From Swiss-Prot:
Native species: Homo sapiens
Protein name (record): Eukaryotic translation initiation factor 5A-1-like
Pfam annotation, one family: eIF-5a
One of the record's GO cellular component terms: nucleus
PROSITE patterns assigned to the protein according to its UniProt record, in alphabetical order: IF5A_HYPUSINE
UniProt keyword Endoplasmic reticulum present: yes
Reported modifications of this chain: Lys-50 undergoes hypusination, a unique post-translational modification that consists in the addition of a butylamino group from spermidine to lysine side chain, leading to the formation of the unusual amino acid hypusine. eIF-5As are the only known proteins to undergo this modification, which is essential for their function.
Reported function: Translation factor that promotes translation elongation and termination, particularly upon ribosome stalling at specific amino acid sequence contexts. Binds between the exit (E) and peptidyl (P) site of the ribosome and promotes rescue of stalled ribosome: specifically required for efficient translation of polyproline-containing peptides as well as other motifs that stall the ribosome. Acts as a ribosome quality control (RQC) cofactor by joining the RQC complex to facilitate peptidyl transfer during CAT tailing step.
GO biological process, one term: positive regulation of translational termination
A GO MF label: RNA binding
Residues found modified as Hypusine: 50
Domain of life: Eukaryota
Subcellular location as annotated: Cytoplasm; Nucleus; Endoplasmic reticulum membrane
């Protein structure tokens, strides 16, 4: 019976988000808008009306797609804030549009897609020239994306 259990693929049960009161959110911070992890680019608060609470108007840009999302919530309500991790990994290969990155543990995951646009072209160009580069990977809410590159320190 106990031999049937497989714990290798589980996580520690950590939540992908944590609650924060709407009035405590700040511009350039992060928040979940319409189910997407976003960076807050605009924020405005309205005064308490005759019927109800002060409201906070949030405008955010999705950290993965760049799409714009808006939401309005009472300042006393809680909003979800995504747990965001930012890590640098050494690029060791590109195959079929996916990056092979060397992690600190020595593992080499090959499931991160090469970003589209200028960043993807720059990564390919530097890799083809034989440059050693670090890829900055942003992780939030079970999604990952390469967001920046930098030269490796010699």
């Amino acid at each position: 019976m106990a031999d049937d259990l497989d714990f290798e693929t589980g996580d520690a049960g950590a939540s992908a988000t944590f609650p924060m009161q709407c009035s405590a959110l700040r511009k350039n911070g992060f928040v979940v808008l319409k189910g997407w992890p976003c960076k807050i680019v605009e924020m405005s608060a309205s005064k308490t009306g005759k019927h109800g609470h002060a409201k906070v108007h949030l405008v955010g840009i999705d950290i993965f797609t760049g799409k714009k999302y808006e939401d309005i919530c009472p300042s006393t309500h809680n909003m979800d804030v995504p747990n965001i991790k930012r890590n640098d990994f050494q690029l060791i290969g590109i195959q079929d549009g996916y990056l092979s990155l060397l992690q600190d543990s020595g593992e080499v995951p090959e499931d991160l897609r090469l970003p589209e646009g200028d960043l993807g072209k720059e990564i390919e160009q530097k890799y083809d020239c034989g440059e050693e580069i670090l890829i900055t990977v942003l992780s939030a809410m079970t999604e990952e994306a390469a967001v920046a590159i930098k030269a490796m320190a010699k």
